[in-house]
A protein has these predicted regions:
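Short cysteine clusters
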Residues: 1, 119, 208-211
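N-terminal extension/subdomain marker
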Residues: 1-46, 50-56, 304-331, 338, ...
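Gly/Ser/Thr-rich loops at beta-strand to alpha-helix junctions
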Residues: 40-43, 67, 114-124, 145-147
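Long, compositionally biased charged/polar accessory segments in the mid-to-C-terminal portions
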Residues: 57-58, 164-355, 361
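Glycine-rich phosphate-binding "P-loop"
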Residues: 72-99
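Active-site glycine-rich loop that binds ribose-phosphate moieties when present
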Residues: 89-103, 144-164
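Short, surface-exposed basic-aromatic patches at helix termini and helix-loop junctions that form
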Residues: 106, 125-137, 156-160
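Short, flexible loop segments at boundaries between secondary-structure elements
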Residues: 137-157, 256-266
Length: 361
């Protein structure tokens, strides 16, 4: 569908397209005046606000928090700039975003912007021609894994004795998770010190563990953080995406994304642990006394910037092959695109592992 949306498929030999999909340009970015309550600086929200200010859309379809649970996503059709304020921030869980499209069209919406994660955007693009909208803008955010809101609350309980006071959580590009609390305090936890081994094996469903579209390749513009080295990361994919970015003008600070470190070692280690976990074996873990030291070293010597983003994309590709081979080998040929095999090949995972013959890892 890349060619249908962008006019061409990714070019394996062009820049980083084999990792991130078709794009015109990559940026490291941040709003000069960050929006209060935003997950990062608020670029996604501000683009949507500017669409209303310039009268370019009739509505924005996005997620808002459930009134009874701030972490639970609820689809909303926003009809004004002011309505976007409540939509800032991150939520965790499943919600039928696209269920509001037909009601929106019935209400007379002809020009629509949608803010969504990859699985939502993929379904949207599949329906796009049938919708017959006069204009559709798609602002995508990356997504690595999702879980139910109930399971996410279980995770929060492992991070704090008072999980109900947590108001913000983000996996940062410096190998830390940042948590913010109701009283304004903050806590940063190195990835290696997270209690991931205490999570149930089905915490992330198979559909997420076998998703190969981390970077939301069918959006007009992807707004994330993985390649931003502490700032936000923009993937401008087509002319519509550039039109959206141009709406910010001098409000946004742009620079070329950096890249440092080497990803092969961390990705290989991830592959070995994923194979063990998929086979029901205990994960190999380092001694507890060594974890703080390695957690301190990783932001300094591990992959950073675009190299970190490349590593995450390769990890998702490897994870997809391993889990499909283990649980749904007959689906491998239809669920694994050609470019994924190119990403896994440097790690010894080739099309010979496509499930035509079932083998144990």
């Amino acid at each position: 569908m890349e060619e249908q949306v962008h006019g061409r498929a990714r070019r394996e030999s062009q820049g980083d397209e084999r990792f991130f999909g078709p794009y015109q340009i990559l940026y490291r970015a941040s709003l000069r005046n960050p929006l209060p309550g935003a997950q990062w600086t608020g670029i996604t929200t501000r683009i949507a606000e500017r669409l209303f200010e310039e009268k370019m859309v009739d509505a924005v379809l996005t997620m808002a928090p459930d009134p009874n649970d701030a972490w639970r996503p609820v689809p909303v059709l926003v009809r004004s700039k002011e309505g976007l304020t409540n939509c800032r921030g991150m939520r965790m869980g499943y919600a039928p975003l696209l269920s509001l499209i037909e009601p929106a069209i019935a209400q007379g919406v002809e020009r629509l912007a949608v803010i969504g994660i990859p699985c939502q955007v993929y379904a949207l693009r599949a329906l796009e021609r049938e919708l017959k909208l006069k204009k559709l803008y798609v602002i995508g955010t990356p997504c690595s894994d999702n879980t139910t809101t109930e399971r996410f609350h279980e995770f929060l309980e492992l991070l704090s004795p008072a999980p109900e006071t947590i108001t913000y959580l983000e996996f940062c590009a410096d190998y830390h998770v940042e948590i913010r609390f109701r009283d304004g305090s903050k806590k940063r936890i190195p990835f290696l010190l997270l209690p991931l081994s205490k999570l149930p094996s089905d915490f992330f469903p198979l559909t997420c563990r076998t998703c190969v579209d981390y970077t939301n390749v069918l959006s007009d513009i992807t707004v994330g953080y993985m390649g931003g080295e502490g700032a936000q990361w923009l993937i401008v994919r087509n002319d519509a995406g550039m039109e959206l970015l141009d709406l910010l003008g001098a409000e946004v600070q742009l620079s070329s994304p950096g890249s440092a470190g080497r990803r092969h070692g961390p990705v290989k280690g991830f592959m070995e642990n994923t194979r063990r976990a998929a086979g029901g074996l205990p994960l190999r873990s380092m001694p507890n006394w060594l974890r703080p030291l390695v957690g301190w070293l990783m932001p300094k010597i591990g992959p950073r910037g675009l190299e970190f983003a490349r590593a995450r994309v390769e990890m998702k590709a490897i994870e997809t092959v391993i889990h499909l081979k283990r649980e749904e080998p007959k689906r491998m040929k239809s669920m694994i695109p050609e470019h994924v095999w190119a990403l896994t090949k440097p790690y010894g995972i080739t099309r010979q592992d496509d499930g035509s013959t079932r083998q144990d890892d």
